[in-house]
Amino acid sequence: MAIVRILSLSLAAIAFPIVGFSMDIGETDQSALCGGRAYTRISVPNGASPYLELTADGVTGPFLLDYGATRSSLSAGVFSGPDGSMRKAAISLPGIERADFHLARYYLLLQPGKGQLGVIGDDLLSKFTVELTEGAAFLSPESCRPEALIARGLTPVAQTGFFSSDPSKIGAGLPNVPVVFLRLGDVRVWAQIDTGYEDFVYSHSVDINQALFDRLVGSGVRLDRINDIDIWTCDGREHRPVYRVEGRPLTIENESTKQIIEIEDFHLVLKPANACGGIADMTEPAAQLGASFLNLFGAVIFDPRNTTVWLGGPRETAVGPADGKSN
């Protein structure tokens, strides 16, 4: 199941000044919890998605680290070739000298000021470790030491069946995309971590499929429809209803039901079935978190070799290096 980032939002009445900058801040950084090279995250006002400056075939520019996309891509406006065609390119990623990319055009409202040179999707992100903090990212070819992360207060979320450097460990019919687990009332479900989904209009957006919507309603959760948003997908223009839930917090847990964080300010966005793949086409309940959820944690670490995602506690109390698509 391929999930390719091609979303855009109709918001003609909303305009944001978009500026961005980034710099490589070191060959290695001893404060990185899993080692690796440190990069300053590119600043995009109102955005939460992680952009870094990388180099592909000698061209340097902003790349989105998109854990919600299963395939990596390069800008068709920069690299020669028709949209959708494949290109093998050298890429400045740990342990990867060259990789296959498809050529694409990017229409997301929030992008760095220099534009977007490419997307690093899970076909490559599943091959190395990434630690994200508020202002930095650490890319490492090494796995993490679980005992060290537990000592720093991070909680492991096992990715068995969902996200791994070993494709044979992925469940049938599932993409290789990292997840957490959500609890709302009596309903518990897995949710993909979509770092490329800029939910800046409705912060803490949780996309849900029809199966999850039906289960929530059947369990007695009251969903109050507050608005609709327009989304362009590979299947054309879609109207998606946006809901609030009053009086019931949303809990983020690991696979063993250990609570990591609880919030009351969130939105549910119903994704209708389409031909684009992803949770909308699944018959079992499923969800997808917007990138603004990254801001809730002191650190987020994707460790595909250990088949684990690590989440720090609430950012204001977390201990870590940070302390020393639009909807």
What is each model feature region?
Residues 20-327:
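Pepsin/retropepsin-fold aspartyl endopeptidases
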Residues 7-17:
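Bacterial N-terminal signal peptides
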Residues 1-6:
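Positively charged n-region of N-terminal signal peptides that target proteins for export
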